């Protein structure tokens, strides 16, 4: 009997089958999500958070903090001209801020001049500087985007000026020119810099700020350049690709509270460096009204009324028990009797104070706050009231 080999077992046929199989495998779709993160950085973000920003470009740190393997983060960083001009001012000197400013300038130069791409498998970078081609609006047009006019009392410690804006100012203690001249000569440059700064509560500048706390604050002039750039990126520029939700819109990263308040008054979301890091790696925006939960799904809807951390209880609304309402216990001895260990009246008085709750009279009082715009409710420490507890048997471990 002869052995007949089928033509299907030829070498050519095996090669064709392998080609077909490889073609089928390559046709399987691979779902890779892409997420846009758009950040505008001012000089304080670099000066106070240069270490955080540099590790955004560190491969090891990225791999240890990203939670999704099938996601690519497109990190867009925009550096306005305002930031570069502030670098020129801050970098002078030997302070830590000056050192960090020079380090930030070197970091930006190395990125822009580096021929090797710094993109990783999980993050694609796009660092750009503000250019003359950007159609930045004039300041008069920017006023159309203003949503709030902040007052002096909205700023921390009523401080509305940058420290550098106070250089060269001297107090008007005396109109005598000879006094002012001698006074200026007796002070160093740094001392003159801090004369009109709000240092402590009893200072004249602090008391003056409280007296005028209801007046509208005045924006530092040079801050307008930053606000203009932010308005252009957030409201005017055509975004490519288009934003999917509010989280992907441009946000200002700053560590300065004055800048933050003014930026928010023009509808610009603000983050600090740590909050920006949450947005990059965890896709969490602190400007949204939800609590950060790394184990929750992005599709979960947050309801503040169902979360205990969002609820507040005013314990002063509950009734206080008076002395007459407190029943006398069987082991109570009169204050003239001696108790165990031969304790006299002093010990009984101490136990009596601990036993009886304070009277409801003058337990809660309301006073005006320092700014005079509202009231604060005070409760005596010894009469702190608690919300009523539910009924039932307390569980105890076996």
From Swiss-Prot:
Predominant place of localization: cytoplasm
Keywords assigned: Cytoplasm, Nonsense-mediated mRNA decay
Organism: Candida albicans (strain SC5314 / ATCC MYA-2876) (Yeast)
Protein name: Nonsense-mediated decay protein 4
One biological process term in Gene Ontology: nuclear-transcribed mRNA catabolic process, nonsense-mediated decay
Purpose: Involved in nonsense-mediated decay of mRNAs containing premature stop codons.
Biased composition, class Basic residues, residue ranges: 335-350
Gene that encodes it: NMD4
Subcellular location: Cytoplasm
Region (Disordered): 327-355
GO cellular component, one term: cytoplasm
Top-level division of the source organism's lineage: Eukaryota
